[in-house]
Amino acid sequence: MSSQDILKLPPPAADARLAYGSDPNQFGEVRLPSEKGPFPVVMNLHGGFWRAQYDLSHAGHLCAALSQKGIATWNVEYRRVGNPGGGWPGSFEDVRNAYRFIPQLGQRYNLDVAKVLVMGHSAGGQLALCLATHEPALTRVLALAGVLDLTQAWQLHLSDNAVVAFLGGTPSEVPEHYREADPMAGSVPRATMQWLIHGAGDDVVPSYFSRNYAEQKKGRGEDVHYLEIATAGHYDLIDPRSRAWPKVESTVLHMMGA
């Protein structure tokens, strides 16, 4: 089986599903460790090039794996292109509201809300780093195979021009959307720890997206760490069965201990 099969496998059941807004796509799934809390929290943002046909289900596998390591997970759904209000800025507004909902989760489930890591895969990596530019209280962010340069994603026509559908046009048509949404254009506070993991064998989002981001942001004085996994593809990073997963998991645990 390839790691892309993770998109189709039914995930382990969540402990709870809670709405953070009134739209049917404004909810998240909570998975808790079996031990006693308080637990650190990973808020996960799934990928799918911001399109409605890809939902949070496949990310349930990695969230379940992290809960076995003593970490509570908040697997977030958000409006996507094809949903009413999805795209920019609606998708990002949902992510921001889901992040701001975490203190309520903390009261209900005995979470350590001082230890929150926001993690995103592919398009979710863009949303995670964009969130870090707008929420200075967020001090841990991890992008897995992230779409971290939206102008370059447009130039390469990644996934049939997904970025044009997400932002509502090209860089010349909606330059303000690219400025607001592009992690490469934003500034993350220096106190925020950023980790990027990318597979050298990624044929969906090229690994140089993360490599270039790390180089440029380090040059601006941001706290950025980059790990490239030689044999990993795009989906290996979110598949707990893969050979790449232990490196993802150990990075999460390292960031939580920092």
Language model segments and positions:
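N-terminal cap/lid segment of alpha/beta-hydrolase-fold proteins
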Residues: 1-36
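C-terminal catalytic histidine-bearing segment of alpha/beta-hydrolase fold enzymes
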Residues: 31, 204, 211-258
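Short, surface-exposed "cap/lid" segments of acyl-processing enzymes
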Residues: 34-38, 42-65
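Catalytic nucleophile-loop/oxyanion-hole region of alpha/beta-hydrolase
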Residues: 54-63, 74-115
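Short beta-strand immediately N-terminal to the catalytic nucleophile in serine-hydrolase-like folds
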Residues: 118-120, 144, 197
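Glycine-rich nucleophile elbow surrounding the catalytic serine of serine-hydrolase chemistry
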Residues: 120-130
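Hydrolase active-site cap/lid region
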Residues: 130-174
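Short beta-strand/loop motif that positions the catalytic acidic residue
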Residues: 190, 196-198, 202
